[in-house]
């Protein structure tokens, strides 16, 4: 706990890992609780949020503070109107999902500091409802799903047997087959891979939907085509990487020497875009999320049930999972096939 040297009687600062220094409003009643609040803040920072969420909350907090400075609001003032204004500002350039993340971060910061903020108050709820209705009219751009046929085309560029090609091929196939988020892919360690007769089991220690770190298991079957088999690609990468404990997917020096440094989440998109470009495809339409979306959409096209798709993607919400398979659904029993590709009619003989 520190005071602002410029205004020692006005502001008390809480140093937190999740948000950095938090300025408490000038309320003497709050200061008697600062030690307890600080302890709570440390506990929340160390246990409550996964690393990717931590980064997202920190970014959200920085943007909220910048907005408050511009508009003359207190970041921890508990002002629902100010938060509503912030959400309205975000609606100009951001998605509803991003706005909800920003709101969750601001609410968490208030809770850590012991300041009441009613996120269901009219100024917040009404803006969110309007935001939701507006984006229902203007659909958001979603990641282009990387379908099986396209993935096979991308894998065709890895003709040379190099450490980088082995790593990148395994990264794409494992990312696709596991339906992991990009942050989850690069968070895997060698120790999280278990070989079994059917294929491999990946142990995901923490994820977006498992903030408490209970862990989840993801199964990947061995394929019949070794060139399009995530298990084979992973085994070939581990052959050159070795089984020394540590990050599964690592950076490489020029020439293929191992660095031991974990890839960053952004590397997933870079590998995918590089492969798309080399395959003559529009690399700009793909993102790291295309692997996850591609598994869900490809499985739906192959006739998989929604519950089985959700088991692999680990979605809790049917509505969110359905977003990924709508592309498959629009082709099911589509009438234009009857009009433009009618079934052949046998000509009568004789």
Which residues fall in each region the model found?
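Extended, non-catalytic subsegments within catalytic or DNA/protein-binding/adaptor domains
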Residues: 1-350
């Amino acid at each position: 706990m520190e005071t602002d040297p410029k205004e020692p009687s006005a502001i008390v600062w809480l140093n937190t890992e999740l948000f950095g220094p938090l300025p408490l409003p000038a309320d003497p009643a709050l200061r008697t609780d600062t030690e307890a609040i600080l302890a709570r803040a440390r506990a929340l920072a160390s246990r409550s949020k996964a690393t990717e969420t931590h980064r997202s909350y920190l970014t959200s907090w920085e943007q909220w503070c910048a907005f408050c400075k511009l508009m003359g609001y207190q970041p921890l003032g508990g002002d629902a109107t100010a938060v509503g204004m912030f959400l309205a500002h975000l609606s100009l350039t951001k998605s509803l999902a991003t706005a909800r993340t920003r709101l969750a971060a601001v609410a968490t910061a208030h809770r850590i500091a012991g300041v009441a903020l009613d996120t269901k108050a009219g100024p917040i709820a009404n803006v969110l409802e309007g935001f939701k209705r507006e984006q229902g009219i203007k659909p958001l751009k979603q990641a282009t799903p990387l379908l099986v046929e396209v993935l096979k085309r991308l894998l065709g560029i890895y003709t040379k047997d190099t450490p980088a090609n082995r790593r990148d091929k395994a990264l794409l196939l494992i990312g696709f087959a596991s339906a992991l988020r990009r942050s989850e892919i690069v968070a895997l360690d060698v120790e999280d891979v278990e070989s079994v007769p059917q294929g491999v089991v990946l142990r995901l220690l923490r994820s977006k939907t498992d903030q408490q770190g209970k862990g989840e298991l993801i199964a990947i079957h061995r394929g019949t085509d070794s060139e399009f088999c995530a298990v084979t690609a992973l085994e070939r990468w581990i052959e050159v990487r070795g089984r020394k404990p540590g990050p599964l997917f690592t950076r490489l020096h020029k020439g293929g020497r191992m660095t031991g440094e974990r890839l960053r989440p952004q590397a997933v998109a870079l590998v995918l875009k590089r492969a798309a470009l080399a395959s003559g495809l529009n690399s700009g339409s793909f993102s790291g999320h295309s692997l996850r979306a591609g598994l869900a959409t490809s499985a739906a096209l192959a006739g998989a049930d929604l519950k089985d798709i959700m088991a692999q993607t680990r979605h809790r919400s049917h509505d969110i999972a359905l977003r990924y398979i709508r592309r498959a659904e629009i082709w099911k029993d589509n009438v234009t096939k009857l009009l433009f590709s009618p079934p052949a009619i046998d000509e009568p003989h004789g």
